Every structure is written in C-alpha cells, then in structure tokens.
C-alpha cells in the first residue's frame, strides 16, 4: 500500500505506476502534445488540458462556505480557505516569510536565487514565472 517504485531520474519524484512516470517526464523534456482548441496553449498532460478547459467554460462547481467565492477546482477552494483560517504552514528558510501554499513559497524562493528558468523563444527575455512568460509571449 502506497508503494511508489517508479522514480524520475530528473527530480526524484516517485510514482506507483510506470505510465504516471512517463507522463510526468514530459515536464522535463518540454514535450507538450496536448493543445487547447480555444486559445492554442499547449500542455504536457491531457489532465492539465482538461482542467484548463474550465477556464474557457467558466465552470466553477466548488464554493467557499465562508464567503461564497467559487472555484473550478477543489484544490483551489482548499487553498482559498486558508485565507479565512490564516494558515501559512510554509516558511522561507532564507527570510522567514510564510505562505499558505507550497507553490507560492517556491515562487518566492526565486527572489533569493534570482532564478529565471523561463525564456521567450522570440526575444530571449527570461522570467522567474511561467505565467509571466505566457503573458509576455502574447505581446509578440
């Protein structure tokens, strides 16, 4: 129970099924075979594309019982609810700033490392966030 024998050689993340490892590995190779027919954005995983489609349909079935705000994904609601509880379990080891989400801490950490792993294929400008690159590329 809970055994994950398939490990990614790039980042050491483990999976219970070989097919999940193969799907995950596309993140590292940059392969993005799934394209949104609405906006042209590409994805490495089919599940991510299907999740992305909710942005276009406006589907938001998960509502916050505290304030009524609705979300397209249950995990987004769970993260939002930390606003009401004030929970910030993730702390930066460099400066002590705390975050409600691990992903926000990872983004913040790039301030300290000055890491900018996302670069524009058109002009070469680099970004610390993929979302900033995405919006920048729309300007070309």
Curated annotation (Swiss-Prot):
Q: Does the keyword Nucleus apply?
A: yes
Report the InterPro entries cross-referenced here: Snail/Krueppel_Znf, Znf_C2H2_sf, Znf_C2H2_type
Keyword RNA-binding appears in the UniProt entry = no
Q: Name one GO cellular component term.
A: nucleus
Q: Name its cellular compartments.
A: Nucleus
Which molecular function term from Gene Ontology is one that the record holds? zinc ion binding
UniProt KW keywords? DNA-binding, Metal-binding, Nucleus, Repeat, Transcription, Transcription regulation, Zinc, Zinc-finger
List, alphabetically, the Gene3D superfamilies matched.
Classic Zinc Finger
Q: Where are the zinc fingers (C2H2-type)?
A: 6-28, 34-56, 62-84, 90-112, 118-140
The UniProt entry lists the main location of this chain as: nucleus
Q: Name the domain of life this protein comes from.
A: Eukaryota
| Job of this protein | May be involved in transcriptional regulation.
For this protein, the record's PANTHER family field holds: ZINC FINGER PROTEIN, ZINC FINGER PROTEIN 646
Describe the family membership recorded for this protein in Swiss-Prot or TrEMBL: Belongs to the krueppel C2H2-type zinc-finger protein family.
Name the UniProt record assigns to this protein: Gastrula zinc finger protein XlCGF49.1
């Amino acid at each position: 129970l809970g055994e994950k024998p398939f490990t990614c050689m790039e980042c050491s993340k483990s999976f219970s099924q070989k097919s999940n490892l193969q799907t995950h590995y596309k993140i590292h190779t940059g392969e993005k075979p799934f394209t949104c027919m609405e906006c042209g954005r590409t994805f490495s995983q089919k599940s991510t594309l299907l999740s992305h489609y909710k942005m276009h349909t406006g589907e938001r079935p998960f509502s916050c019982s505290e304030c009524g705000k609705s979300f397209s994904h249950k995990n987004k609601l769970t993260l939002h609810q930390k606003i009401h509880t004030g929970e910030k379990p993730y702390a930066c080891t460099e400066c002590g700033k705390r975050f409600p989400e691990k992903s926000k801490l990872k983004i913040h950490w790039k301030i300290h490392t000055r890491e900018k792993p996302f670069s524009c294929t058109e002009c070469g400008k680099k970004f610390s966030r993929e979302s900033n690159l995405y919006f920048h590329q729309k300007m070309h």
